[in-house]
Amino acid sequence: MKLLCAGVPFLLALCTLSAACSSNKAALRNDSGSPNDKASEVIHQSRQGAEKVTEFDLNHDGKPDVWEYTVKSKTAEGKEYDRLVRKEMDINWDGKVDVVRHYDENEQISKEELDLDFDGKIDQWNYYEKGVLVRKERDLDFNGKPDLWIYYEKGHIVRKERDTNHSGKVNYWEYWENDHVDRIGEDLNGDGQVDRWTKNPNPGG
């Protein structure tokens, strides 16, 4: 059976960067510009509005590796604090942003953007609800548009969808049960409907 890739292994450096941010010596960066929401554009986003940017040099090469963006906010008790809204990371030490994490009002991750081929553009989008991963979108042909969608429930894959002919429409579906593919649906005529189902003869393997 044809199975879709479950995801791209994350570089060990990403974990190191995330864990070390809170304790590393910080320096402020003055930066301004407008945000860019287009998927085909560069992954780096300039400081927006009243955001404050703090830089971290984790490998001590004199260049920043992590950028934390915060805004002034208040707790329920009215106490002011710097709320994290976005974090950018350079995980291969080339001076370019490779990962961007967005955070909600509770400072839980809500979205993650990744540059998998290190060309400065977004290739994967991860979406979270209350800090829990619910969907991944991948741009497999690097044209700035997702063509693979992976859906999660309680940390497990439940469905994958794929645009295999670059038509902009899903024409391939995988339904998962107990961490294995249960059945595959294929659209053979481009009408957006499943024309052929294939049952996995060995769903536990």
Language-model segments: residues:
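Positively charged n-region of N-terminal signal peptides that target proteins for export
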Residues: 1-5
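Bacterial N-terminal signal peptides
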Residues: 7-18
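Calcium-binding acidic motifs and repeat modules
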Residues: 21-205
